[in-house]
Amino acid sequence: RVPDHAEITTIEGVGTLSDMHPIQVAWMAYGCAQCGFCSPGFIISAKVLLDNNPSPTREEVRDWFNKQRNLCRCTGYKPLIDATMAAAAVMRGEMTKEDLVFKQTGDSIVGTNYIRPSAAQKVTGTWDFGADDALKMPEGTLRLALTQAKVSHANILSIDTTEAESMPGVVRVITAKDIKAAGGTNKINGLVMLPKHNKTDGFERPVLCDEKIFQFGDAIAIVAADTEEHARAAADAVKVEIEELPAYMNAMDAIAPDAADIHPGIPNAFFETNCIKGPDFDWDSIPDSQQVEIESYCSRQPHLHLEPDCGYGYIDEDGMITVHSKSIGIHLHMPMIADGIGVPMENLRLVQNHAGGTFGYKFSPTNEALIGAAVKILERPVSLVFNQFQNITYTGKRSPAFMNIKLAADENGKLLALWGNNYVDHGPYSEFGDLLTMRLSQFTGAGYGINSIRNKSTTVFTNHAWGSAFRAYGSPQSYMGSEIAIDVLAAKMGIDPFDIREMNCYKESEGSTIPTGYPPEVYCEEELFKTARPLYEAAKKRVAEKNAASDGKIKYGIGVSLGVYGCGLDGVDTSNAFAELNPDGTVTMYAAWEDHGQGADMGVLVSSHETLRQAGIRPEQIKLVMNDTKTCPNAGPAGGSRSQVMSGNACRLAAENLVAAMKKEDGTFRTYDEMVAEGLATKYEGNWVTTFCADHPIDQDTAQGDPFATYMYTIFLPEVAVNTETGKVTVEKFTCVADVGTIMNRLLVEGNFYGGLVQGIGLALSEDFEDLNHDTTLKNCGIPYLSLIHISEPT
């Protein structure tokens, strides 16, 4: 309890936009404010520490943040420690605030530590998130709450809203019948991507459940009231009579012979993909000593974004139903919800809020249809803000996968064949499940020249949390199959796990091809292994020395794995952006490059400036209008590692088209007034399309084709300590050697690397969402704190 008359300092009292505290400056300089949701808490915490301990060690900073229970889901923590140490040096007078900040020396900012445009607002507490916006909505705004399912599978017999409608402050209780009466189908369009072997049409998910409950938390009714407290109380008073049904909480239970269809008439195993590459392989032709078979499981990893799901809606000045949310696919979500709520696409507008992290869960619509339906039916502004329990239990999760992989090699360790039979638990709704499962065909065994692959993967409906996109979408499931199999095979054959990977990596001299049958766009892995070799050997020496000094209770080891991932949506992908010259000589970029903390604002800025600088445009002269379907062209979703490739190139092309129009014959550039005087347009579109992917589309029978414009490649070298008595694993050092293409902004690349590493460690060691009675808090879901990762170094 805070004592009476205590002085309380908030982020607003630390520093302002015009007079920042050294900690705030350091937070910007080290790229700490990614989504920015945790920044005020960390900055306040760091200030208290440095006020009392002006010269802390790195370990003392870590311990302090742990003690205060400060959490970050974006950065992987290392930049936060770096920034705190740098701020301490400034506060001790050893350097100035100006020394911390990147100083542009040339006219290009590509590959530099240029600070993202939103950083200053994020570190001063002036960057409003969705719940902040909701507090500022006009008088008469209705607050929404949901009546949600308390079981995982049931038939709905009746819904009685009588008591709820009579409770204080309640304006209306909306159920499925109201949505249908307003012209909606009450169905989310799951957008079937691969129809040939898909047994569903994608319309299983209701906006509001009226006949069945398919998972815990399913929305049954929306209560609109004058306050959130009144709305929540009334939502609890809605009476739902059910007939509870057996709940199939994993894929294997759902495909058991006696399992009933979760969606009547649609089999629970609703999609299948087969990777069929090269000739058949005779597994009896090689001895058992040269082949292995493994079974593995990739858990139902929760995203654990710190900002609970939230949004609001209203009818705008043009009569458009407008929904603000954390969507990372504003144009993608429009066709998914429009018919369901009975709003024509041309009358629907989606806007992305400043999002406190999503890590992919907002590739799926969550609250958009609920808010849109409420706005249409009520014709008043509304807001819907989840608490953390709702956030964890009723947003999508990484789809678990049961992997069964066989791997064979010749007597020297050269890989000959891979076989697989895998099951993906995608929860009760199909949306993007086919695309996810296709990733298992594309990335199981990726990175290695394996000539014969027979790998079958099946997508299964269950009654657990619906499957949604998560960082590296589909590849963790794949690599928990093939990378584990390679380790087991290496151990069985007495080959070093680094050596067997280096021996089998993609090589142009061998004509290596990816699992889908085509050459990679670059052959870079040999160079990566060459670079990683001395780092690996040094790590082996370190862990050997530690083991020699250990009493055996703690054992140390070095791991190695290879990751490859495609950039883009399968096949022909496209993105659009606008560049507009303004009367004052500035340029406005319009881009629906959604930002969930990864740095879309910086992406638009650096991608456009590299061209606009030819016309003398400085970074600070570029204005950004982003993530509004009313003003920005369709750039596609910010998922699938596609944004810098697709939207970055769209911004580049828009800038090129503008600069080309501005350029005079003598090489100088027209002003805005000159453009207008000559009748030239001042706004230009950039459209980037991967037309070359049309040459080799994915074969839905064999998964063969060339689906992505480009790939990323990384060698991972974690050093771990294992307590042999408890089995607890601690990651002590993590080194990566990567080819991620052109680094447009170093702070963004490093920050996303660190954050991805920590989420990968969490997936491996602690994070899961399985027990609905336990896994309902950030802590219980296994979110990592600082003590788990001692140091991580992308190389």
Give names to the regions the model predicted.
Residues R1-Q104:
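Signature of N-terminal electron-transfer/Fe-S-associated modules in redox systems
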Residues Y30-F37, W466-S478, G640:
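A short glycine-threonine-serine/GTX helix/turn-capping micro-motif
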Residues P79, T84-L142, A181-P195, P279-I294, ...:
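Cofactor-centric catalytic regions
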Residues A88-I266:
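Flexible, low-hydrophobicity surface segments
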Residues T141, C310-E317, I450-A472, D584-Y590:
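Residues forming anionic-ligand binding surfaces in small-molecule and nucleic-acid pockets
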Residues M345, P497, R618-P619:
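Alpha-helix N-cap/start motif
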Residues S787-T795:
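Residue-level detector of conserved catalytic or cofactor/ligand-binding positions
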